[in-house]
Amino acid sequence: MSMSSKNENKISVEQRISTDIGQAYQLQGLGSNLRSIRSKTGAGEVNYIDAAKSVNDNQLLAEIGYKQELKRQFSTLQVFGIAFSIMGLLPSIASVMGGGLGGGPATLVWGWFVAAFFILLVGITMAEHASSIPTAGGLYYWTYYYAPEGYKEIISFIIGCSNSLALAAGVCSIDYGLAEEIAAAVTLTKDGNFEVTSGKLYGIFAGAVVVMCICTCVASGAIARLQTLSIFANLFIIVLLFIALPIGTKHRMGGFNDGDFIFGKYENLSDWNNGWQFCLAGFMPAVWTIGSFDSCVHQSEEAKDAKKSVPIGIISSIAVCWILGWLIIICLMACINPDIDSVLDSKYGFALAQIIYDSLGKKWAIAFMSLIAFCQFLMGASITTAVSRQVWAFSRDNGLPLSKYIKRVDSKYSVPFFAILAACVGSLILGLLCLIDDAATDALFSLAVAGNNLAWSTPTVFRLTSGRDLFRPGPFYLGKIWSPIVAWTGVAFQLFIIILVMFPSQQHGITKSTMNYACVIGPGIWILAGIYYKVYKKKYYHGPATNLSDDDYTEAVGADVIDTIMSKQEP
């Protein structure tokens, strides 16, 4: 090599070093502006995030503000699976069917269909959020991102608390439903000669929570495979019901209920007016069953190609459960004893157990209730996984007590063991309400619904108002015309549901055993969360807290993102 070539190479290397040093000083001088932009519509300064232009999951997660700590083991099918598993159609319908029959067959059939349509609209909007900013924290992160400047921290903190407690209440309601199903199976084997007490139910419930805690502490790859098992288990039991129940009904009961009974028989078993009872009895089965699609969001940091797989998981799980659940209810109403009161007053304590017993006999009823209980267990394991990821993410941002311990991730298995333990302990404590009476148990169902709907609707309202100039769509987006129409319609439905779940099952003669304590517990939790933040937590919680250094950030996002951020800085 000639001397001139060596000199040219030396100069080229020196120029690159000089350029890199200059860029480093330039980036260092940007300070907090290194990764942020300022809203023009009142949302203040937030991270620059553009999912549509990100080239991989790690880059997008870095733009959001976090390093990759959990392993991405969930395929699109398994992301769908965690929501579909938690919805657990037949086990969930079994748990809420008694309340739905309070308005007669037509209320249950059409209430499900109408409510599920609006739930799909809510899910579509959440899918847009998840496609734009896929992070395990989800709801409280989005709230902080779009909320007005000066209110970001307290509102996002309240939403984080609401979502965490609602998911924990969801664990309680699912596991309590499992306890009831196991008790119903035992009662069937003893021909009704078994006393089910609140103490026995809590014992079964607590045992289930402990077993689920152990099961969900395995590596994320095993948890992902569990979702595949749950998909096939739920589909198997549904197909079995579609085949066996009509055959048994025709053989043992001589035929089916006609279309007028299934689609037109309305029977108000409360003292509310017919319209309100239709909403109370008809909407709640679908709202509670198809109510865990945000679990896909909480798996965002374990999902492959999250900006696409999470939206697909949300929308597909809702759509499948909408139609498949509706067909299940039609099948059950075709086969049910026309004397609804005899089903609701079943000595087995479970309306579905009585329907199966009437059509198929004792052995089939025991087998079905055992299979339903198994699927309900898979539901519980899946929602325990989801709530642990929400608890972990919120603790990562110092949102919970003992956050410095809860946010730890095991380096070998990439699993947040302490978050799983915290979620299960919280569920056991909330579950103590079941020892009081049925009204307190019902409050757990209502708390899960109200808390989640508040958490789901809040970031949407802010995205459409104060943060409208910050929203950068991901791969899934309805467009500028349809997106806000769908979003506002979903918000209106969610506000209606929050109000609806606060009402008791009857209008007059309310006693302590018929009172709906959700109207006290829900708002009480939200108010206490705000007070707790003002008095203590504001010293530690400042919204989503990045765990990336500036060097890690610039390396992860690349020069193009840095150039875009710098070009958007105000002079």
Curated annotation (Swiss-Prot):
Protein family per UniProt: Belongs to the amino acid-polyamine-organocation (APC) superfamily. Amino acid/choline transporter (ACT) (TC 2.A.3.4) family.
Function: Required for high-affinity, high-specificity GABA transport. Also transports putrescine.
Gene Ontology terms: cellular component: fungal-type vacuole membrane
Annotated InterPro entries: AA/rel_permease1, Amino_acid_permease_CS
Protein name: GABA-specific permease
A single BP term in Gene Ontology: putrescine transport
GO molecular function: gamma-aminobutyric acid transmembrane transporter activity; gamma-aminobutyric acid:proton symporter activity; putrescine transmembrane transporter activity
Further remark: It requires NPR (nitrogen permease reactivator protein) for its full activity.
Record's keyword terms, sorted: Membrane, Transmembrane, Transmembrane helix, Transport, Vacuole
Taxonomic lineage from the root: Eukaryota, Fungi, Dikarya, Ascomycota, Saccharomycotina
Membrane association type: Multi-pass membrane protein
Membrane-crossing segments per the record: 74-94, 106-126, 154-174, 199-219, 229-249, 272-292, 313-333, 365-385, 417-437, 442-462, 483-503, 515-535
Gene3D superfamilies on file: Amino acid/polyamine transporter I (1.20.1740.10)
Stretch forming the signal peptide: none
Biological source species: Saccharomyces cerevisiae (strain ATCC 204508 / S288c)
Vacuolar topological segments: 95-105, 175-198, 250-271, 334-364, 438-441, 504-514
Name of the gene: UGA4
Positions in the Cytoplasmic compartment: 1-73, 127-153, 220-228, 293-312, 386-416, 463-482, 536-571
